[in-house]
Each structure stands twice: as C-alpha cells, then as structure tokens.
C-alpha cells in the first residue's frame, strides 16, 4: 500500500480526538436553558411525557445543540397510573406535584411532592409502574437518566403493560 492510499484510509484515532473536542466545545457553547414551550407533550406507552433532553445517538445522530448530550430528561403527568415496564435502574424521579406510589419489583413505595424516587441498578433491570392517589389531580414529576450508567448496565426496555390511552401509530 502506498502513502497516498494510506492517507485516504479512515483514521479512527483522529475521529475519536475530533469527537471528544466537539463534545468539549459544545459543553462551552451549547444551549444551557431548554424551554418547555419548544417540547410538546406526547402520549407514549408509559403515559403523557415531555422530553427535554434526548441523546443524539438515540435519535439518528442528529446534531445536538445543548451543552449536555448524555442524559434523558423528561416530565411526566400520571392521572391514574403509568404503563408498566422493565429496564435497568439508575433512574431518578423528582415529584413536583401530587402523591401516589410505585410498585418496584413487587414492592410498594409511597411518595409525595418533594420526594425523590430512585430506581436501583439490579441484574436484569427493575420492573416498575407508578400510581396516582388522586386521579382528579395529576401527579407531575421530572425524571433523569444518565445514559452512561444506563448503557453500562446493558439496559433493555421491555414494555409489560401499555398506558391505557396509548394508541399505536400505523407503520409507514
């Protein structure tokens, strides 16, 4: 192989360095305030949610404009109950309004506004579902997942029960 051919080969080491530099640069110049108005509420399998941060690698490597890329951050409203699913722990939920309970691996955990709910990291993940005590007044919370921890635990999302208001969209 001549020098000219080698110069056209992909240089993964240089791509790593460039990627790390881009991450660092974005941490200095990226968006640090994410406005709720720009993010719609969406009915998904777990309930009514509004995403604030979503990693680029989960969304087709779209360009990221925020200072952080390694987090999933979303708000959720729970009227009666959420869907039920299992995934690796490392999830942090801060309850803003209301009260209720969660069933986490068969154990009932009661919570109210101002509480922090932590889903532990366990082999095989954590099965959980959330319930509102007063269906006339929705529970509101914000949840945080650090994707490095989530992926380190080889997380797999397994939906066990869908939220009753979720409707599957036809595939195109």
Regions found by a protein language model. Name each.
Residues 103, 131-133:
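A generic structural motif
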Residues 73-78, 86-102, 144-147:
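Short, conserved beta-strand element in jelly-roll/cupin
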Residues 125-131:
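Short, Lys/Arg- and Gly-enriched loop/turn segments at beta-strand edges
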Residues 54-59, 71-87, 120-125:
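Conserved short histidine dyad/triad with adjacent acidic residue
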Residues 93-94, 118-119, 134-154:
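A short hydrophobic beta-strand segment most commonly corresponding to one strand
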Residues 1-68, 156-172:
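A short, N-terminal "cap"/entry segment at the start of jelly-roll beta-barrel domains
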Residues 94, 106-123:
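Short acidic-glycine-tyrosine-enriched beta hairpin
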Residues 102-103, 152:
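Short loop/beta submotifs within extracellular cysteine-rich repeat domains
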């Amino acid at each position: 192989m001549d020098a000219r051919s080698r110069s056209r080969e992909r240089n993964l080491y240089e791509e790593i360095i460039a990627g790390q530099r881009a991450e660092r640069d974005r941490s200095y110049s990226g968006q640090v305030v994410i406005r709720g108005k720009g993010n719609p509420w969406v009915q998904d399998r777990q309930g009514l949610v509004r995403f604030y941060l979503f990693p680029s690698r989960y969304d087709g490597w779209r360009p990221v404009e925020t200072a952080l890329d390694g987090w999933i951050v979303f708000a959720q409203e729970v009227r009666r109950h959420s869907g039920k699913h299992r995934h690796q722990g490392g999830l942090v939920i801060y309850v803003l309004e209301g009260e209720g309970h969660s069933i986490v691996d068969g154990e009932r955990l009661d919570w109210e506004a101002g509480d922090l709910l932590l889903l532990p990291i366990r082999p095989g993940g954590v099965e959980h579902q959330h319930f509102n005590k007063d269906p006339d007044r929705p529970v509101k919370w914000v949840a945080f997942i650090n994707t490095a921890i989530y992926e380190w635990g080889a997380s797999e999302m397994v939906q066990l029960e869908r939220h009753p208001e979720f409707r599957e969209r036809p595939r195109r």
